[in-house]
Amino acid sequence: MKIIRLLALLLLLATLLTSCVISVGDSSVLNFLSVQDGSVVVHARSGPDATITAAGDLTIDGKPVATTTEQQALLKQYYDQALAIRAEGVATGVAAASLAHKAVSNVATGLAHGNSDSIGPRIEAEAKTVKAQAMKVCDAVAELRKTQDALVASLPAFKPYALIDANQAADCLSK
């Protein structure tokens, strides 16, 4: 019975990870957000992509968008937060993979030695650490949403790229 609870906990952690972060490298950060060649690329539901550089420069469909100093600062903040989500996602993925490896190893060892009762508490304690790491991703998504909303209020051209809604940020935090 405890092994079933453990496996359910691991599935919950996997769900947490996949609901927020997709992959790494020159890669996706969220479903609509990726990092390519050192820039953050925001994919609109329809229409051209927007690219944000580390300096806070914005291009839409490859064309520079004129911005004020305040807007550029918000774009730089958006860029930094997107990279933070990716970094937190990588750290969470590594921790979850390590936990999964330990869980499988501990289950096999525990079953082989008839000591399955001690497996659950050890893995559950480590799973709390992974869940806390995953919550950092969710917190970062919520912060990115705030920056996104400030950008939309300040820079109407960014509106098609405001794809994080209140439910998405809240759903991640509630898991």
Enumerate the language-model features and the residues they cover.
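Terminal leader/tail segments of proteins
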Residues: 4-5, 20-175
